[in-house]
Amino acid sequence: MKAIQLLWEAIMEATKRERRREDDDGEKASPESLVLPPEIITEILLRLPAKSIGRFRCVSKLFCTLSSDPGFAKIHLDLILRNESVRSLHRKLIVSSHNLYSLDFNSIGDGIRDLAAVEHNYPLKDDPSIFSEMIRNYVGDHLYDDRRVMLKLNAKSYRRNWVEIVGSSNGLVCISPGEGAVFLYNPTTGDSKRLPENFRPKSVEYERDNFQTYGFGFDGLTDDYKLVKLVATSEDILDASVYSLKADSWRRICNLNYEHNDGSYTSGVHFNGAIHWVFTESRHNQRVVVAFDIQTEEFREMPVPDEAEDCSHRFSNFVVGSLNGRLCVVNSCYDVHDDIWVMSEYGEAKSWSRIRINLLYRSMKPLCSTKNDEEVLLELDGDLVLYNFETNASSNLGICGVKLSDGFEANTYVESLISPNSYGIES
């Protein structure tokens, strides 16, 4: 990668010299005088990081055309995903704590404990219209014009508010920066698309008053990005609908007989081609892992391990995640826990096993492994924690210039050129 970068810098310098010669002579260079044929330049560009390619857009028409071409973006992404060592170089951590920040994932595995962060100008970051919408949803239409409310709530406080990270896939991050607003956002290129509003179930008067959760993932069979939304229409019924980026529209799927709990307020986790939550099955009052298959758009159940239900706390609930390529669930309540339940064989109920960790927690979610699979990044009781399963050692990570808020969110993404605005357009 370093050699390619150096070669590219040499090409850039030669291109600049050629431009200066054109300016001095007052004529354009012939194709024979180009430094390298376009096809060679394309091959070199394909092996550069997405961020570097973006910086070269203004160099020439060829570079600008390639960097914004959907077909080029897909080939570039495929080269990244095909090789694990290359993919790890392009992986980033995105954190939501008042604002959105990206962290260099490799620096975590290199032993750096105070991480540098890049703040993002995500969609609607300073948009006053979203602030107005938030106030209306918060206080209700009948109080919206009350000046006393406006004195307590202001746009400055909103800009320091919450951004929900729904999920990520192939460089696109699904975020919800305000009431009713959902975006597909590429942190690498800055491209974004606001998704159309979903239709409201007939039995729901105001969606903001009802439980709702999202899940985001990629359908490789149809080359489509999908967002599934679940809304509670009663205590034991969830209304399911799905958004297709290709069609740019929502479709209602079905009703589900599940009760939500506190842990299910978190977004679903994308793993093994499906989105996962933990809900309570209404008829038997039994908690299950519910999986939404992104390709077939069907729901299926997997049992939660029986022993994991031993927690007697009345507000006990489960959070689903992934750990070293395996599905896992963790208990989250006001009692402390020290274990993680891992499914060794996906879909096999008998493959659940308990892993004890040398940490006590009330709320915890595994985020991802570092370059060394023995180390895992955890979102633990409001802290970002690096845990080593081999030595049972742990360390809290800090982010330079960022104070993590209680209940911050984090996810991983890969740097890519994929644009949410290019779908439905032939490359």
Curated annotation (Swiss-Prot):
<dbReference type="Pfam" id="PF07734">
    <property type="entry name" value="FBA_1"/>
</dbReference>
<dbReference type="InterPro" id="IPR050796">
    <property type="entry name" value="SCF_F-box_component"/>
</dbReference>
<dbReference type="InterPro" id="IPR001810">
    <property type="entry name" value="F-box_dom"/>
</dbReference>
<dbReference type="InterPro" id="IPR011043">
    <property type="entry name" value="Gal_Oxase/kelch_b-propeller"/>
</dbReference>
<dbReference type="InterPro" id="IPR017451">
    <property type="entry name" value="F-box-assoc_interact_dom"/>
</dbReference>
<feature type="domain" description="F-box">
    <location>
        <begin position="30"/>
        <end position="75"/>
    </location>
</feature>
<dbReference type="Pfam" id="PF00646">
    <property type="entry name" value="F-box"/>
</dbReference>
<feature type="repeat" description="Kelch 2">
    <location>
        <begin position="316"/>
        <end position="362"/>
    </location>
</feature>
<keyword id="KW-0677">Repeat</keyword>
<protein>
    <recommendedName>
        <fullName>F-box/kelch-repeat protein At3g06240</fullName>
    </recommendedName>
</protein>
<dbReference type="InterPro" id="IPR006527">
    <property type="entry name" value="F-box-assoc_dom_typ1"/>
</dbReference>
<dbReference type="InterPro" id="IPR036047">
    <property type="entry name" value="F-box-like_dom_sf"/>
</dbReference>
<feature type="repeat" description="Kelch 1">
    <location>
        <begin position="224"/>
        <end position="270"/>
    </location>
</feature>
<keyword id="KW-0880">Kelch repeat</keyword>
